[in-house]
């Protein structure tokens, strides 16, 4: 959940509505994977969520963690780590989104990070902020 918390902090600090009110990010109380995906979707439906950002520090099956709701705009941050490169995950999940006709925005850092580095790299931060600003009314 460290990546999700870092993304939440970055977005809430840097993205605001036209009246200056910061956007609010909601993190699911459980991780998305298998049966938990339905719990996350149900929780998000009660929180007025309009966009979803999936993050993972590990290689996993993209279809396990992807948001299949047609009601939200999607983005995925794949961690570029020394032990677990997220490029394979990103390619798999982006292909799955494309096969389902769901547009999604991908984020992948240029520089490799250590697995215990929970910071959002500058290039990813710029992509994340731009993506989130595009979701505002």
Where are the regions that the model predicts?
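An N-terminal assembly and electron-transfer interface module characteristic of large anaerobic redox
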Residues: 1-137
